[in-house]
A protein has these predicted regions:
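Asp-box/BNR beta-propeller blade signature and adjacent active/binding-site loops
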Residues: 215-572
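Extracellular beta-strand elements of beta-rich domains used
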Residues: 203-210, 562
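Localized edge beta-strand/strand-to-loop motifs within extracellular or lumenal beta-rich domains
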Residues: 144-158
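Short carbohydrate-recognition loop motifs
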Residues: 47-72
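Extracellular carbohydrate-recognition regions
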Residues: 28-55, 217-218
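Flexible glycan-contacting loops in extracellular carbohydrate-active proteins
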Residues: 169-204
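Secretory/extracellular carbohydrate-interaction modules
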Residues: 66-124
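Short, aromatic/His-centered strand-loop micro-motif at the edge of beta-sheets
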Residues: 125-147
């Protein structure tokens, strides 16, 4: 695991988070100082992503050293109040557009932008251009420690180098300001998140701390399941998470062997855990077609037989998405299926089912990503459902993008094309509603919209109503996951869970809850507030919740395991 936490009081912070989860608020401690790196040492409150060395390793006896792209040291918590002071004492081994800087609420405050080495900032407040504040020359020198102070008070931010104010920003946003929901539970609202990154520099960190007048909200701890750059795999992407009938956790992913591209030598792989996520097996290959694309895993378990099915898609590594042809030829996208009867240890030879799973005028095609479902109620109880998407290229007509469903009524032996949505939707997941309807929640594609698309089927996924945009589910045009946590009974409401990067850009992975079958989403938790993308949810047999998610620019796929769900209203 490449993410490291400071040691010492992890248990205390974990218990605080569980308290928050159950709706118990910790005491507010005004003026609290939160030390992330103190005297060159990572504290129990900080975490790193990527390579680092510690004070005393011979590189520097007094500093924590962070090196390279996609390497961060961040606060292992969020802060309720946005009124805060961020302080860092650091040095860079070089200047020259290194990209090193301080992250504050989705904005980067950097030290040497461009060839002229200017101090500046970038992020939503500044639009598509970088804001230049001052010249680095005379203020920052290579291998010379300097002090950075960022102070936010009632939305007014000041940026100082060595005590000199170099920049000011009015109306600076809090961390969660862009979540468009007035009824979200208070436990997830964050005023501030922060991190340091090295990028193209060797960043020596002598001190990194936050002073805040509000409460500190620890983030859930995570475990890395797939680390990009490990073994023989350049990049792992596209997670799917499933619990077998026996309770085994199966974490699927694409293993992109020689590059991070969507078109490469890609295999579908899985790792297994028989102890609730504590330990994991080695990687098992599910589907490998030489050096071609064999990915987009969409697994589903048949609860009546215990068989685990995995559907995925294939294309030649020489054919990019925009080059895929309609039909079923060698230049087209094809659908394959495999299964396991021993809880995911071994997998049958994959079978091509394209003829029954794809229409002639479809070109691009993707299963999932994420797990499928088995219907539990109504006329179609037992039906297996696989969410998919495709691009349609009808002869003489415009190309359009749609979500659709594959279904099986004979325990996975045969598959049929079911409901299709209207144009403008893409990757999707399905969930069964209390009345047996099937709801499809879809990513937007090809339209200027940043809200999830929602479609309803009243016949088990064979036809859809026209879809609607859900203004409570903001998205950056990215895959998301939706799952049923529990059914309603006489004592408690049913619960749906939804996870995605909850802004217009790919960060702030949130887990939300609905108690009215997706009409509203009044409760939410922050899972990971930094760079993130695809995710998948699973509900453990004991009621705990697992979220498998991409993070840190696809450098890893992590698993967060959370306690059983208790709405704020139940625990007040």
């Amino acid at each position: 695991m490449d993410m490291e936490f400071g040691m010492g009081k992890q248990l205390t912070w974990t218990l605080v988070f569980v308290g928050l989860w159950l709706g118990v608020s910790p005491k507010v401690m005004p003026g609290m100082e939160y030390g992330i790196i103190v005297d060159g040492k990572l504290t129990q409150h900080g975490a790193i992503v990527g390579r680092s060395t510690r004070a005393g390793d011979g590189i520097d006896d007094q500093a924590f050293v962070l090196k390279g792209l996609y390497k961060f040291v961040y606060a292992g918590a969020g802060f309720r109040s946005s009124n805060a002071r961020i302080h860092a004492r650091i040095s860079l081994n070089q200047l020259g557009n290194t990209g090193a800087g301080v992250l504050v609420n989705g904005h980067w405050f950097t030290f040497d932008i461009g060839p002229s080495n200017q101090i500046g900032a970038a992020g939503p407040v500044f639009g598509k251009t970088t804001k230049v504040f001052a010249e680095a020359e005379g203020r920052i020198q290579p291998d010379t420690p300097f002090d950075v102070d960022i102070v936010i008070q009632d939305g007014f931010l000041t940026y100082a180098i060595n005590g000199e104010t170099v920049g000011e920003v009015k109306n600076f946003p809090s961390a969660m300001e862009t979540v468009p929901s007035k009824d979200v539970g208070s436990v997830h609202k964050l005023g501030l998140i922060t991190a340091l990154r090295s990028w193209r520099a060797d960043l020596k960190i002598y001190d990194f701390r936050v002073e805040t007048d509000g409460e500190i909200i620890p983030l859930p701890e995570t475990k890395t399941i797939y680390q990009s750059g490990s073994a023989r795999t350049n990049t792992y992407r596209i997670p799917a998470l499933l619990a077998s009938k026996q309770g085994t956790l199966l974490a699927f992913a694409e293993a992109r062997r020689n590059s991070g591209s969507d078109t490469a030598d890609i295999d579908t792989v899985v790792r297994r855990s028989e102890d609730g996520g504590k330990t994991w097996s080695d990687e098992i290959t599910v589907f490998d077609e030489q050096d071609n694309v064999a990915g987009n895993p969409c697994p589903v378990v048949d609860q009546s037989t215990g068989r685990i099915w995995s559907l995925q898609t294939w294309n030649s590594h020489q054919v990019h998405e925009n080059q895929t042809k309609v039909g079923f030829g060698k230049d087209s996208r094809r659908v394959f299926i495999t299964y396991s009867d021993d809880d995911g240890k071994n997998w049958a030879k994959a079978k091509d089912i394209t003829a029954s799973a794809k229409e002639e005028h479809w070109s691009w095609y993707a299963t999932g990503p994420g797990a499928g479902i088995q219907l539990q109620r109504g006329k179609h109880k037992g039906r297996l459902i696989i969410p998919c998407d495709h691009k349609s290229l009808p002869e003489g007509g415009p190309q359009t993008y749609h979500s659709h469903i594959l279904f099986s009524d004979d325990h996975g032996e045969t598959w049929h094309i079911g409901a299709q949505t209207g144009h403008g939707l893409n990757e999707c997941e399905a969930v069964e509603l209390e009345n047996g309807d099937v709801m499809l929640n879809s990513r937007n594609h090809g339209v200027d919209e940043f809200y999830r698309g929602v479609s309803i089927s009243k016949d088990g996924g064979q036809t859809f109503s026209s879809f609607r945009r859900d203004p409570k589910l903001l998205e950056p045009r990215c895959q998301a996951s939706i799952r049923r946590y529990r059914w309603a009974d006489n004592h408690q409401p049913g619960v749906l869970l939804f996870s995605n990067p909850a802004r217009k850009w790919r960060d702030f992975l949130m887990l939300r809850a609905s108690y009215d079958d997706g009409k509203t989403w009044p409760d939410a938790r922050v899972i990971y507030p930094y760079t993130t993308a695809y995710s998948d949810i699973v509900v453990f047999p004991d009621g705990r919740i697992g979220i498998l998610f991409e993070r840190d620019n696809h450098t890893k796929i992590d698993l967060a395991i959370l306690p059983s769900w208790s709405p704020v209203s139940e625990s007040d």
